[in-house]
A protein has these predicted regions:
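Glycine-rich phosphate-binding loops of nucleotide-dependent enzymes
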Residues: 1-174
Length: 174
């Protein structure tokens, strides 16, 4: 709870140090309430009083999102949130991000897991070593020859032409 309350302190006029010193009990209670609401919002309500370090890695990532949400952002910036997560943890994270999008939250996602990205985005930019390769909707981008070359090693010229148009599933791009 206190972990997420740090995010709420960032948007308050009290500040982190005043909050840490407990100088304003009413304000502290309000910030803790906001932190609890954000924890419940991301589906971790049953772990409200659990220490963050005791949570599984996927739950810790979701808790980090709750902390960011406590600062009431207009845009949520996420840098590789699915890195190192197991399949189920990625699915749980994806559900949280889908929920936030449904609520109208704008999300900028930097991620290398293409299955994860394709499931969540309605518009994406693909880069390779700092160079933009493609931009558009997932269905178009995943058929882009430059994207296929960079992330899948190119199109196999031994395949019949009809097979080139079929979605490819390797490294997460379908």
């Amino acid at each position: 709870l206190e972990n997420v309350a740090l995010g709420a302190h960032l948007r308050s006029d009290v500040g982190v140090w005043a909050g840490a010193l407990h100088t304003d009990r009413a304000r502290e209670a309000q910030l803790l309430h906001e932190a609890a609401e954000q924890i419940k919002r991301v589906g971790l309500g049953e772990y409200l009083y659990e220490q963050a370090g005791n949570l599984a890695l996927g739950q810790q990532r979701i808790l980090e999102i709750a902390r960011a949400l406590a600062s009431d952002p207009v845009l949520l910036l996420l840098d590789e949130p699915a890195a190192g997560l197991r399949y189920k943890e990625k699915q749980d994270l994806a559900r949280v991000l889908e929920q936030l999008r449904a609520e109208g939250m704008s999300i900028l996602l930097v991620e290398h897991d293409m299955d994860f990205v394709m499931r969540l985005t309605n518009h994406l930019v693909v880069m390779d070593f700092g160079t933009k390769l493609a931009e558009g909707v997932p269905a178009e981008v995943q058929q882009n020859p430059a994207v296929l070359e960079a992330y899948l090693g190119g199109i196999d010229d031994d395949l019949p032409e009809a097979d080139h148009a079929k979605p490819v599933s390797a490294g997460g791009v379908q």
